[in-house]
């Protein structure tokens, strides 16, 4: 269970829980593959937590022109 960032706060940035999970998963995979971090400091040590922090900060968003990519 995640305590920070809260799901309610994250859902202010992403329209559904499904989209939130898919976006966080894709970003976590990118971080694991060596993608550059988008924040200077993270509270979480795990890639999924870092991805959620980036979403909360508005650094990672869903491109409305590529929403079908989330279903892959």
Curated annotation (Swiss-Prot):
It comes from the Bacteria. Pfam families: RNA_pol_Rpb6. One of its GO terms (molecular function) is DNA-directed RNA polymerase activity. GO terms for cellular component: DNA-directed RNA polymerase complex. GO terms for biological process: DNA-templated transcription. Keywords: DNA-directed RNA polymerase, Nucleotidyltransferase, Transcription, Transferase. The keyword Transcription applies. Its EC number is 2.7.7.6. It catalyses: RNA(n) + a ribonucleoside 5'-triphosphate = RNA(n+1) + diphosphate. The keyword Flavoprotein does not apply. InterPro entries: DNA-dir_RNA_pol_omega, Pol_omega/Rpo6/RPB6, RPB6/omega-like_sf. SUPFAM superfamilies: RPB6/omega subunit-like. The RNAP catalytic core consists of 2 alpha, 1 beta, 1 beta' and 1 omega subunit. When a sigma factor is associated with the core the holoenzyme is formed, which can initiate transcription. Belongs to the RNA polymerase subunit omega family. Promotes RNA polymerase assembly. Latches the N- and C-terminal regions of the beta' subunit thereby facilitating its interaction with the beta and alpha subunits. NCBIfam families: rpoZ (TIGR00690). This is DNA-directed RNA polymerase subunit omega.
């Amino acid at each position: 269970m995640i305590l920070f960032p809260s799901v309610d706060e994250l859902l202010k940035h992403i329209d559904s829980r499904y989209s939130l999970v898919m976006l966080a998963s894709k970003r976590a995979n990118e971080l694991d593959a060596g993608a550059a971090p988008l924040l200077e400091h993270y509270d979480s040590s795990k890639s999924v937590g870092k991805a959620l922090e980036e979403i909360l900060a508005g650094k990672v968003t869903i491109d409305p022109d590529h929403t079908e990519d989330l279903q892959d």
